[in-house]
Structure formats: C-alpha cells, structure tokens
Amino acid sequence: MRAQPAASHFVDGRPLEDAAGAPIPVIHPANGEEIARLHEATPAVIEAALASGARAQKDWAALRPVERARILRRASDLIRARNEELSILETLDTGKPLQETLVADWPSGADALEFFAGLAPAVTGETVPLGQDFVYTIREPLGLCVGIGAWNYPSQIACWKAAPALALGNAMVFKPSEVTPLGALKLAEILIEAGLPPGLFNVVQGRGAVGAALVSDSRVAKVSLTGSVPTGRRVYAAAAEGVRHVTMELGGKSPLIVFDDADLESAIGAAMLGNFYSSGQICSNGTRVFVQKGIKEAFLARLAERADAIQMGDPLDPEVQMGPLVSPAQLEKVLSYIEKARAEGGRLVCGGEASVSPGCYVQPTVFADVTDGMTLAREEVFGPVMAVLDFETEEEVIARANATDFGLAAGVFTADLTRAHRVVAQLQAGTCWINAYNLTPVEAPFGGVKMSGVGRENGRAAVEHYTQVKSVYVGMGPVDAPY
C-alpha cells in the first residue's frame, strides 16, 4: 500500500518539493515495504519555511483571539470527520494497530486544537493597583516557534505543539521525525483547509542537521522538542546560544508502584497499558513495576496469562491488539535489552522473542526478580519489556522509585487513598497517576522533571510556554524627580 504525499514539505500554504535533498524512505514496520519516499529539506526549503513563518506571524497575532480560535475549531472538526482515513495513515507510518490509532492519535490531536481554541479568548492580563497609579500586564505571543517531533506519536505530537502555538498568536515550523514523516503533512493541509493563513504552520522534513538549522536560526523565539535525552541536550545547547524559550519532553524510566491492597486486575491492566500499548514505545511508560512482596507471585501469574493472550499481527486488522516496533533498528535495540536482562539474572516470565515475520515484532515480555542495578531497571528500552521488582515497605519503594536520573511519570495503585496521596507527594515525577496509568487528557499539563525535560505541554500551563508577559506602568499624576 502506497501513501505518497503530494510533496515532501508543506511551506507557505502549499506542498513544496526539492528533490535535491537526501532521500527519506518511509517504511511500513509490519512488512518492511516502502510506502513513500520523501526528500530532506535543503537550505532553500528551510529558509522558505522560516521566512514565511516570520512574515505571517505578525498579522496572525494581531487578530482577535476568537478569530484564531474559529480556525482551530474547524480544523478539529475536520480531523474528527476524517479520523478513519487519518488513522489508517498513522498505522502505515508507525505500525501501531488500528484499534489504537483510531482512539489515541488523531483524536487526541483534535482535542488539543479544540481545547486551545476554547482557551485562547480567555488568556488575559492582570491589573495591579498602586494607589492612584497602576500596572497592567499583557500576554504576548513569542513569535516564530520551532517544533521537533518524535516517531512514536507523530500526529498527536504535531497537534500538541501546533495547537497552543497557533492559538496564542505564534507561527510554527515543524520538523517531524524522519522515521514517521507523513502525519504532520496532513495536519498542515487540514489547517489550511480550515482557514489558517499560509506560512503559519510549515512542515519540513529531515534528520538532525535540519533540526539544528531550525533551532539555531536567529528568527526563532521558541523551541519545543519531544525526543531522547541526548537529542534534548544538543537542542537545549543550541537554543541557549540564542537565549530562546525551550520546552522539552524527553525520556523516562517511570515507576509503577502496586501495594498489596490494590485491585489486582486493575493494577495488572495498568502495568500492561504502561508497557505494551504502542508496543511499549511511549515515553511515560511505567517500565519499573514495583510490586509488594506478598502479592508478587499472584501478580506475575495473572500478568503472564493476560500478556500471552495479546493478539499480535497485521496492525491494519481491527482485531489486532499489538503491532510491530517502528523500525529494524528499534527491534535490534529492544532484543539487545532482552538479552542483557537474561544475562544479568532477570527471570523471564513471558515473551522474550521476536515474533510474526516479516516485520519488527517483539512478544510482550516480562522479567521478574529485577534489581535496581540491572540495565533493565536503569535504561529506557522503548519496547514491550516490563521489569518487575519487589518491595516491602512504603519508605523503601519511594526511595527506590526516585533513584533514577529520569522524572517523567509515576503511578501508585492502592485502596488506601491517604497513602496514595502521601506517596505521590514524595515521587520525583512531573506527571503522576493514582489507580490509573498513562491517561494524558489535553486539559491537564504533561511533562517531566530531572532529565525527563523542562516545561509543560497541554493544559493552561502551556500558555506560560508560548507567551511572554509585558508589564505596563501607568502614571496618573505628575512625575516627581529629585533633580
């Protein structure tokens, strides 16, 4: 099945091709077939995207917020009306099963556009009384923003970054991952159809050099990245050269803590969602599952039973529950972590093998008897590999859960809500769940601490990261100067 777009890039309101750029083959992970071939952005394409964005942004910012909101709301409606065809494209691009993409990818993007459309007219300043004088504040857009996406949720990420940027009066040049480049082009088309003026959301394709060129350009006021910690470090350093605003959502090695009074089926379901959904390729996954000793074996037995029942296969089959990893390179990486876990003494409970050939499939895999020092407990795998660790006391598990450089997410399962709140208050994570896991509604802020990132996406908190405050002092009387 082919999914060739009209052109590799979308700049100034139209598809744009420049075949001089290095080729980017788009491979369907389920069978290894090339479904499209794009080209990397040349310097001319990058310049056109930045120039048109900078030019269009000023008029866009001058519109009433409600006028901007109408366009984003129309785009949200268009996405929902076309969700099935967009979800099929997302499945072809990523390998995620259709039963996931129909509910979790473009629908979340539509939610973001709708949410920020509703929020935009309510973003106002404040008045500070100072006797007869006063100060008022204005929230102003930052200007030209750069968004850099990841390959695991390409279309959702594009929407999560574009929605607040555009709603608040900014322009954005977006570079999707070269592994999954197709969804962002569809978003650009839909925004234009909804009435967005040309130049405000441009899409350019490419690898790291293209991202570096965007981030280092003097016209760029803000960078929003979703990616790995090494990429984040490089982008952060480049943005710092120009003292640019930065939001980063990076990796994680998140703890999911299950106390012995938890509802076992719910806790197991959450652990599976937090390790096997999207074939485990989710940054916030709870890949360190801490289970209190008294229920560990019962937890593992039922977990293995449910994991073995997961239906793998063609992701376009609506009955399939788990698809392939995104690429052969990711498959090789995940299999290497499985071998390390075996070598370091992990007890394989289920899975552990490549599965369903051709394609980049790995069975849902669970290791028990994992200790804090093992590679599987320290490094982000980004695949369907769960590490189960046991614990005895609340104090112990809090200390061990926090003993990581990451701090993206955490979860707690217990029937004792007092304990749940007490534990969550001590966990070093930007996003926490109690008796739930990996639910990320756009109404709530999302982001990490420590090496997992800076800033927040979604919720009202995103306003802080796409606007700047101007203070205006108003003197109501004569100026009293001492000279």
Curated annotation (Swiss-Prot):
The modification Cysteine sulfenic acid (-SOH) is found at residue 283. K(+) 2 binds at residues 243, 450, 453. Its cofactor is K(+). HAMAP family: BADH. It comes from the Bacteria. GO terms for biological process: glycine betaine biosynthetic process from choline. Signal peptide: none annotated. It is an enzyme of class 1 (oxidoreductase). The keyword Metal-binding applies. InterPro entries: Ald_DH/histidinol_DH, Ald_DH_C, Ald_DH_CS_CYS, Ald_DH_CS_GLU, Ald_DH_N, Aldehyde_DH_dom, BADH. Binds 2 potassium ions per subunit. It catalyses: betaine aldehyde + NAD(+) + H2O = glycine betaine + NADH + 2 H(+). NAD(+) binds at residues 149-151, 175-178, 228-231, 251, 283, 380. Pathway: Amine and polyamine biosynthesis; betaine biosynthesis via choline pathway; betaine from betaine aldehyde: step 1/1. Dimer of dimers. This is Betaine aldehyde dehydrogenase. Belongs to the aldehyde dehydrogenase family. Keywords: Metal-binding, NAD, NADP, Oxidation, Oxidoreductase, Potassium. Its EC number is 1.2.1.8. It holds the Pfam family Aldedh. The active site is at 161 (charge relay system), 249 (proton acceptor), 283 (nucleophile), 457 (charge relay system). GO terms for molecular function: betaine-aldehyde dehydrogenase (NAD+) activity; metal ion binding. Involved in the biosynthesis of the osmoprotectant glycine betaine. Catalyzes the irreversible oxidation of betaine aldehyde to the corresponding acid.
